Amino acid sequence: MTDETSGPAEPVTDAPGDAESPAQPKRRLRLLLTVAAVVLFLDVVTKVLAVRLLTPGQPVSIIGDTVTWTLVRNSGAAFSMATGYTWVLTLVATGVVIGIIWMGRRLVSPWWALGLGLILGGATGNLVDRFFRSPGPLRGHVVDFFSVGWWPVFNVADPSVVGGAILLVALSLFGFDFDTVGRRRPGEDAEPSAGASDSTPEAPAADGPDKPAGPVGPEDAAEESKTVGHQAEPS
């Protein structure tokens, strides 16, 4: 006999969050590449203008002698560090760019996409100089043009890389992972260990051989009295 009150089965549909989750890495990758493209564009344009308008060794004052336009050719890393290792820095920067692009395909956090985009744009901007400026490929000198006080001369790419790295460190410290949208829950890492401890079987108590439960008969009582008597005898 069939139940006439039951209606037709409703089709099972995915939740809106499940339908959007596969598209999130693609959107984050687009955000990453957009930020990187903006940084790269600003870096390349400002370097071209600096080379055309500035003369090496002749700073142009912006705020006295504290902030100036100063054209410098840098063979080292950001802020004129590690000079003399140009080809090593070029290979390292190339590896960083490849790693960020590979990681960008799995990004879910928009903040991680922003930080990685800043690093990618800055690293790519300096790589353009490494490959296409004198004295040659892998050995090209980066164009720096902005000087602030005692700080080394830098360009747009340098603070972009440093700012992106600081952002990623802050996100990691505050519990924002690259593969999640929000913060990581504080007890999320402790749950597996707690579950494992609960499932550990308890060891049986070693109290000697088990005796059958039930009423004590005359023979058992006599045996117990003999045992007590032997224990009470002086040694």
UniProtKB/Swiss-Prot annotation:
Membrane-crossing segments per the record: 31-51, 84-104, 108-128, 156-176
Compartments (UniProt record): Cell membrane
Function: This protein specifically catalyzes the removal of signal peptides from prolipoproteins.
An annotated Gene Ontology molecular function: aspartic-type endopeptidase activity
Main location as per UniProt: membrane
One Pfam entry name: Peptidase_A8
Gene Ontology CC: one annotated term: plasma membrane
Location of region: Disordered: 1-23, 185-235
Involved pathway(s): Protein modification; lipoprotein biosynthesis (signal peptide cleavage)
EC code(s) of this entry: 3.4.23.36
Organism: Mycolicibacterium smegmatis (strain ATCC 700084 / mc(2)155) (Mycobacterium smegmatis)
GO biological process terms, semicolon-separated: proteolysis
InterPro entries named among the record's database cross-references: Peptidase_A8 (IPR001872)
Effect of gene knockout: No processing of prolipoprotein LppX and synthetic prolipoprotein constructs.
Residues annotated as catalytic: 144, 158
Membrane topology: Multi-pass membrane protein
Listed name of the protein: Lipoprotein signal peptidase
Substrates-to-products reaction catalysed: Release of signal peptides from bacterial membrane prolipoproteins. Hydrolyzes -Xaa-Yaa-Zaa-|-(S,diacylglyceryl)Cys-, in which Xaa is hydrophobic (preferably Leu), and Yaa (Ala or Ser) and Zaa (Gly or Ala) have small, neutral side chains
Keyword NAD set for record: no
Keywords: Aspartyl protease, Cell membrane, Hydrolase, Membrane, Protease, Transmembrane, Transmembrane helix
Protein family according to the UniProt entry: Belongs to the peptidase A8 family.
